[in-house]
UniProtKB/Swiss-Prot annotation:
GO terms for molecular function: UDP-N-acetyl-D-glucosamine:N-acetylmuramoyl-L-alanyl-D-glutamyl-meso-2,6-diaminopimelyl-D-alanyl-D-alanine-diphosphoundecaprenol 4-beta-N-acetylglucosaminlytransferase activity; undecaprenyldiphospho-muramoylpentapeptide beta-N-acetylglucosaminyltransferase activity. GO terms for cellular component: plasma membrane. It comes from the Bacteria. Cell wall formation. Catalyzes the transfer of a GlcNAc subunit on undecaprenyl-pyrophosphoryl-MurNAc-pentapeptide (lipid intermediate I) to form undecaprenyl-pyrophosphoryl-MurNAc-(pentapeptide)GlcNAc (lipid intermediate II). It comes from Xylella fastidiosa (strain M12). The lineage of its organism: Bacteria, Pseudomonadati, Pseudomonadota, Gammaproteobacteria, Lysobacterales. This is UDP-N-acetylglucosamine--N-acetylmuramyl-(pentapeptide) pyrophosphoryl-undecaprenol N-acetylglucosamine transferase. Its EC number is 2.4.1.227.
Amino acid sequence: MSIVVQSAVTHFRPVMILAGGTGGHIFPGLAVAGALRARGVPVVWLGATGKMETHLVPKHGIEIQTIAVAGVRGRGMLALLGAPVRVLRAIFAAMGVLRRYRPRVVVSFGGFAAGPGGIAARFMRLPLIVHEQNRAPGMTNRVLARVAKRVLSGFPGSFVAEEVVGNPVRKDIAGLPAPGVRFSGRSGPVRLLVLGGSQGARVMNDALPVVLRVLSDSDVAVEVRHQCGEALCAETERAYAYAGVAARIEPFISDMAAAYAWADLVVCRAGASTLAELCAAGVGSVLIPFPAAVDDHQTRNAEYLVAAGAALLLQQDRALYVYLESVLRDLLSDPMRRLAMAEAARGLAKSDAAECIAEIVLEESI
């Protein structure tokens, strides 16, 4: 399947990006695609039929080719037994796409199509670059890293032989003033930003109103901005109303740079892209990793920020409410600690990641 936005006919061989399935794979790929196109390099995308990338990528003016491929984890024994045949078909389909476009280099950011696409690139002796966003690498990139020409990572410790380049973030977030400048002279209520992600995190929607109600007995005033996901807005509003806590409830925040600039502290999950944004913006955080994340990669991500003093880590378990109350009580009343965490986060930032990856791609082009 082909969704054509820009012509594949060009005087230059394109770079092919392999990424899909989740925004955590797609958005870093889009950032690097933008950096390459700014240099006049054409880009074509290989994704999986019917997945998120087929909707997102064309909106950025990038041509996408798709192959039929799906994951096998958690799909039962029949899916596992039939996997080799489906994988071989996907590899041959990917080889057909590669023959058509003859890319100068292939870059994997992970996802369903990345495995067959990367293996096909290896068979065809095309340069393969792998970028892993998480500290615990996904299955696809673990396989491809063994045959890739360059292995890049967003965090240290993903692979033994790696180049740590960071995860791409939007320029408006990377361009925010330093924490000391933003927080200087700030007065009024402490500004708490809660990010549940595009689908919403029900545990945060449930926990924050209850915890903030308990904290209302303190001397610290808190202003809350809570992004809860479209499907969970009504129940989140009811939870805050029942708790008697005033909050600005939003299904989606379009201007994340402004939200980070506003915040004194963030409570959120620990996806790689979110953590890269926290570091680029320079804001301290309380991280609650998604417990069902594959290979518990969000906990591994969070531990990196915690070790640097940029965040605190809470597990989603029965004691969450108790620990969240204790942590927020301390942080909301301690502006110097919040500033120290924000500065530690900023110290981890690699705000030029997209440009760095683009340069590496061009170095390896044939």
